Amino acid sequence: MTRARRCEVFDADTVGVYHCFNRIVRRSYLCGFDPRTGIDYSHRREWLYQRLKSLAKHFAIDVLGYAILSNHYHLILRNRPDLVQRMSDEQVVRAWLKICPSRGQRCRGLSRDPSDAEIHAEQSRANRVQELRMRLSNPSWLIRQLSQYMGIRCNAEDQIRGHFWESRFGMRRLLDEAAVLACLAYVDLNPVRASMVESIEGYPHVSIGERLRAFDDDAVDTSSWLAPLELAGQCDGTSVTVVNRLSRKQLAEILDNSSSTELGSLPMKLEDYAELLRWLASQHRGDGTTALCRVPSILTKLKLDPVGLSSSANQFGRRFSTAAGCPASLAIEAERRGRLRIHGLGKRSQDHCRGSDSTESTAPPTPR
């Protein structure tokens, strides 16, 4: 079976949510303690985190979630073609030169703003602004800048040459709200599943830990780079749509009625999401036989199947290839790509994740 091309997975003209991931070459622990060499490279996780944070400020891409581990990372990104279209030509060029400064600035180690002459030089190149506008809302270019930076810096520290990353990064499109929820939980629980920490608050380089620290004592300012978790509007169990597959026209209608360009991520508050993660973590550890009886109330409000969500959140990477969603969402995505079907859940998995009150509910379960 041929591999889906990246251009099939990513739709540049539509706001979409994507799960992106990459692994270090030969699965070596080059961003943590490496048992083979006995060297601790944990400080490199902070390098990757700071670079991601810096890039997020200049790209027209929302970072919904992240997890940086010893030998791989996960990102949940939302492209924002609506934002980049609002930017002037000068703003586009200035943002790109902050991401990729001129050779002279790099050689001198400068971090100043680009000069008017540098901006004019870029603008005068044929089709250059149009190309840069496309890049600023393309997750592939953000991952490229992130991976290249880490590869060069880590190889320089080790005084070696060669590949740092195993291959090109993987990308999976999240087609509906339940897929976004399941994937975000999968990413945020990665350190817990890897037995690196026991609680969701205990790991420094994961999005849920950063959100909770900011919520508790304002110790970390996420407002400038990490997308808000809670959707705008009321979160009272009523139907709310995550903006993850709208056209520019549809998105413009929403933003015209709002003073903010932040879209949010999930139809729930941070407290509800944290409670859900703790419950999912207890399911993974098998803490007690009555855990299923203490299902978080948010699942009842959103009418989600707890068994299906738990299974999807713990095995998300194995269940879906280049797209994730309920069978109806996968069928629509297959039609968009001109394919007969997209690999998703097998019949056995669908039966396992089917809700007791509906024969159409599958994992990730779709809000009804």
Go through each PLM region and give its residues.
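Short catalytic/metal-binding and nucleic-acid-binding patches
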Residues: M1-R368
